[in-house]
């Protein structure tokens, strides 16, 4: 995490003050852009397939991916065929849009789409143009609904339902817009969101993250023997939650190593650990499997929404005509 990013979650500093003019400019541009779409001066793209956006108003580490995994399972259980679109941060394919398959790599598609594909084996289209992503899914798959992994601020794309994920621990940091703070939009934006969900905490409208058994980065086999000590490595927005989950399992962390979100690992990053145990997140694991050692493991986590979230979501699905009979 850079010094600027650290300042977002600390008392106002000189760095924050110096960045306020840029934050004001960011607000002006983003507000104008949203207004142009709201007034119809710029045209939205409306797909024939309903779109559910899972996003946030702040950058990094809010925990969208576990909720996307749960949402896919929930919709599938209702008999719907689900596709996913993603920007594919960290990926650099030769051509977009890209339809993810078993040959796709994190270098092409980004870490989160590869994680989602490994877990779900569902149609996933990746690329910077969300309209093209949607059209590719509609042309290649028989789908009933599309989940947009991120995209709340992509006002060119019409959507049926918006779900905003909020980190209960970090909330909105200093409450300022980028780059003076972590916000992509002001907190007033939450008033227009269909479903605001906290990741953790005590809010009735939340989900908790449930860690599963550690798995091998090399072959995805489940670890049966307990690990007592390990090095923790992560390239995610909020590594503290991950490290606390490991410690809660009784694992002593010999060292912790943080890289920027979506960092592309190489084998050289791990030479310092020799043959000692290394633990990482599932998002990190999909980038390290090609050069992993036997004693590298990742921690899968699953979202467990409250009844309040599930009931509100089901009502929205029914009201929007996505699903009948709930």
Curated annotation (Swiss-Prot):
ATP binds at residues 58-65. It catalyses: a lipid A disaccharide + ATP = a lipid IVA + ADP + H(+). The keyword Lipid biosynthesis applies. Its EC number is 2.7.1.130. Pathway: Glycolipid biosynthesis; lipid IV(A) biosynthesis; lipid IV(A) from (3R)-3-hydroxytetradecanoyl-[acyl-carrier-protein] and UDP-N-acetyl-alpha-D-glucosamine: step 6/6. Disulfide bonds: none annotated. Signal peptide: none annotated. InterPro entries: LpxK, P-loop_NTPase. Transfers the gamma-phosphate of ATP to the 4'-position of a tetraacyldisaccharide 1-phosphate intermediate (termed DS-1-P) to form tetraacyldisaccharide 1,4'-bis-phosphate (lipid IVA). NCBIfam families: lpxK. Belongs to the LpxK family. This is Tetraacyldisaccharide 4'-kinase. The lineage of its organism: Bacteria, Pseudomonadati, Pseudomonadota, Gammaproteobacteria, Alteromonadales. The gene is lpxK.
């Amino acid at each position: 995490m850079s010094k600027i990013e650290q300042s977002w979650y600390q008392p106002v500093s000189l760095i924050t003050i110096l960045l306020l003019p840029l934050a004001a400019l960011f607000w002006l541009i983003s507000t104008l852009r949203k207004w142009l779409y709201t007034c119809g001066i710029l045209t939205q793209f409306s797909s024939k397939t309903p779109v559910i956006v899972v996003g946030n108003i702040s950058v990094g580490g809010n925990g969208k991916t576990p909720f996307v995994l749960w949402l896919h399972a929930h919709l599938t259980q209702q008999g719907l065929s689900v596709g996913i679109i993603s920007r594919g941060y960290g990926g650099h394919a030769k051509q977009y849009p890209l339809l993810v398959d078993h040959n796709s790599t994190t270098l092409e598609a980004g870490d989160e789409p590869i994680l989602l594909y490994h877990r779900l084996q569902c149609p996933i289209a990746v690329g910077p143009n969300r309209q093209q992503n949607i059209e590719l899914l509609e042309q290649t798959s028989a789908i009933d609904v599309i989940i947009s992994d991120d995209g709340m601020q992509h006002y060119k794309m019409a959507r049926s339902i918006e779900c905003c994920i909020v980190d209960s621990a970090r909330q909105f940091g200093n409450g300022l817009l980028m780059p003076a703070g972590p916000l992509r939009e002001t907190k007033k934006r939450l008033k227009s969101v269909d479903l605001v969900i906290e990741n953790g905490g005590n809010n009735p409208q939340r989900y908790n993250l449930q860690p599963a058994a550690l798995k091998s980065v090399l072959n995805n086999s489940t670890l049966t023997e307990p690990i007592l000590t390990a090095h923790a490595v992560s390239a995610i927005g909020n590594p503290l939650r991950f490290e606390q989950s490991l410690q809660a399992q009784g694992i002593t962390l010999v060292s912790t190593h943080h890289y920027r979100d979506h960092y592309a690992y190489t084998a050289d990053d791990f030479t310092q650990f020799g043959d000692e145990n290394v633990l990482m997140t599932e998002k990190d694991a999909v980038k390290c499997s090609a050069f992993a050692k036997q004693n590298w493991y990742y921690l899968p986590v699953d979202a467990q929404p409250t009844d309040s979230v599930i009931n509100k979501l089901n009502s929205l699905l029914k009201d929007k005509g996505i699903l009948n009979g709930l």
